[in-house]
Structure formats: C-alpha cells, structure tokens
Amino acid sequence: MGPRFQPDDTLYKRRNTLKVEYVPDDIVGRDNEIEEYEAALQPIINGEYPDNIFIYGKTGVGKTAVTNFLLNELRESADHFEVDLTVISLNCDGLSTSYQAAISLVNNLRGHENHIAETGHPQSKVYRLLWNELNKLSGSVIIVLDEIDHITDDTFLYQITRADNNGYIDNIQLGVIGISNDSTFREQLDAKVQSSLCETEISFPPYGTEELQKVLEQRAEIAFHESALEDGVIPLCAALGRQDGGDARRAITLLRKAGDLARTENANSVTTDHVERAQEKLEAQQSMDIMRDLTEHEQLTLYALTTLAAEGETPARSRIVYQRYKELCEFQGREPRTARRMRSFLSDFEILNLTLSEMEHRGQDGGTYRQHELNRDIATVVDALQTIIGEFGAHQSIIEYLPDSGEEFATM
C-alpha cells in the first residue's frame, strides 16, 4: 500500500495565493484609494517629512493589503533612490492600553534578547526607552499601527504623533499610519490627537460586486489551472461576498473552500454547487465563533432559549425566556441581569442572525408581545455552548444533543 497522502494538482496551481496573508503583485479594485495613499507617501522619496495617515473601513475592504503593497513598493523605491527608510509594523489587537502599546513598540525596536518585561515599569521610563530606540534610527521612519482602534486611550497616540514637536526625537523624520476597522474611531480621539494623526484620511468603502469579481478573477488566475472553475463560480462568490458586506477576504476564503471541497470529492472542476455548500459551512462556522465569543450572560440567555426550543416551546415570549434564564442563573448562584438587559441580548442575537423574532398581536384585550426562536439548529447551538453547559449543568431537554448523551456533564 502506498502513502496515504498523495500530491494532487488537478485543480490548484498555487493554493496559497487564496490565503489572507498573500499580497498580490498588483492590487485591483482600489485605484482611487491607491492614488490617494501614494500621494501621501510620496514626500518620503522626496526627502520630505511624511504625513501621518489615518486609514479606515470595514474588515476585508483592502486596507491592510493596500498598505502592505504600497509599503513594499515604497521600500523598493527607497532602495533605488538611496533614501534611508525604516518601516515598523505593530498590530494593536490585544493592546488595549497605551502602556501596552508603548512597550510592544519598544520591544519591536529592540532585539529579542533585549526585550523588556510587559509590566512593572513607570510610564515615563517606557517612553524614555521608546525615544532612545527611535533616535538610534535615521532618515524616514514609518510606524504602521494596524487595528489601532483596539487602543482605548489617547496617551500613546498623542505621544507618538507629537514626538517631534515635543522634542523627543531629533534624528529621524517620523510618520504614523493608523489603520482602523471602526469608522467612528477618529471622532473618539482627543482633538489634538485627531489633528496630528489624521493629516491625511483615506476611507476604504466596501467592495461592490464588480470589484469583488475583479479581485477573485486575479486570484483565480494565479491559484487554479485553466478550466478548473466552471462558469458562474466567480460571479456567485462575488455576489455572496457583496451580501457579506463587500468583504474581499470572505469572498476569497469562499472560493478557496469551494476549491477544497471540489478537491476532496475528486471533482474535475469547481462548480456553483461547491460554492453554495462551502458558503453553508462558512456560515455555520461563523455562527459557532460568534456564539463562543458571547459573554457569560449572553450565552446563558441563548442557552435558555435553546432549552425551550428542545422542549418544543418556541417561539417563546420574552418573559418565558427570562424565567428560564433566571433558573439557569440561580442554579449556580449567579445574579441574573434585569429582564430589560436580557431582552437587549435577544435583540442582539437577531442582528447576529442567531435567532428570529416577531411581534404577536392578540386583539384589543390580548396586547402585543414579542416571541423568539432559534435561527440555528439545536445541535449546533449546544455544541457552541458546551463550556457554559459544562459550568452550569446540562438541562434535561438538551441531553440528547450532547456528546455521549451528556455523560461528562452534570445535569440540572
């Protein structure tokens, strides 16, 4: 018997080009944004002081891809024209405070063996170390702060964008590029930070269907063999990506998942049926991720509705859901949130497409009330809520949906 895993290049030429991390040789569908961005970076090649640039738009609209593409081009131009340029990139995901951001930037600038501890330093010392590290550099320095909206206070942004004005740096021309998924982040900043960080603002709108189709056609040409995709595959991926908010990452991932599904089935080509089934799987996984990321009391509210669904008692009125939610809380001695707060959780679930609700009218005397039901099958929700079920106990109604009939779970 031969090896279990065999090379397979029937469909793909370069599957990796359908990964989020891949930066293409050319960016399509973002001509206007690239033109604005390029103009803002041009002063660096001229030997002039760079502008600070604020980039904003939803996830998957090309902000990071365009930034990486243009910075690669900028480095090549700097090498060609012998311009002294250093680019420092910092992803701010997980850096909720200015203190954390400043330490991360210090450690980014220092060699790994010279990293400082993440806690225990006076703030003044951290910034002194930061200025010392920056002053070891020369020429133009660009600091890229991706997901900048994760930093919840302004101190770091104020310090870094006004370092030259405040006399902290004297050997470099410093520019900052801030990238945010939150279009309202700018309005939340202190006025001084706004004026410093947002010298140039570039908005990235969601991709339209035609733009997504161009993006997908570019990737497909590199990733797949000729004739590997049937007619209609790319238009369908683009249309579904547009429905998901014009998210190019999502559309590219969908195309890759459809290709993987076709390869698993030993198909000779990728069809629209593969796309539709891949979309169903992605939506299911997205729902799982959303449910697992809910807060404890949000999960308990969803758990309460799920037990009612398992009993065949949905659609259920808000007060019925609240009664079951209180029972779950009281079983573990937790203080329940108010009924009003729990109703806000239910409203959020509907926005997230986890549940459905409708207003019920019972005539003049019966009043009006809202009823709720799951928009996902019970087994999927139970699977996503296993941690909270393990902590609070398995309600009798959902035992059959648990692994091994709930043997490892305490019952209520």
UniProtKB/Swiss-Prot annotation:
Keywords of the record: ATP-binding, DNA replication, Nucleotide-binding
InterPro entries attached to this UniProt entry: AAA+_ATPase, AAA_22, Cdc6_C, Cdc6_lid, ORC1/CDC6, Orc1/Cdc6_arc, P-loop_NTPase, WH-like_DNA-bd_sf
Entry keyword Nucleotide-binding: yes
Signal peptide: none
Pfam families: AAA_22, Cdc6_C, Cdc6_lid
Cell wall biogenesis/degradation keyword on record: no
GO BP field: DNA replication
Molecular function terms, GO-annotated: ATP binding; ATP hydrolysis activity
Annotated positions binding ATP: V61, G62, K63, T64, A65, Y207, R219
Alphabetical list of PANTHER family matching this protein: CELL DIVISION CONTROL PROTEIN 6-RELATED, ORC1-TYPE DNA REPLICATION PROTEIN
Function: Involved in regulation of DNA replication.
Family per similarity comment: Belongs to the CDC6/cdc18 family.
Family annotation (HAMAP family): ORC1_type_DNA_replic_protein
Protein's recorded name: ORC1-type DNA replication protein 2
Organism field: Haloarcula marismortui (strain ATCC 43049 / DSM 3752 / JCM 8966 / VKM B-1809) (Halobacterium marismortui)
Lineage: Archaea, Methanobacteriati, Methanobacteriota, Stenosarchaea group, Halobacteria
Gene name, Swiss-Prot/TrEMBL: cdc6b
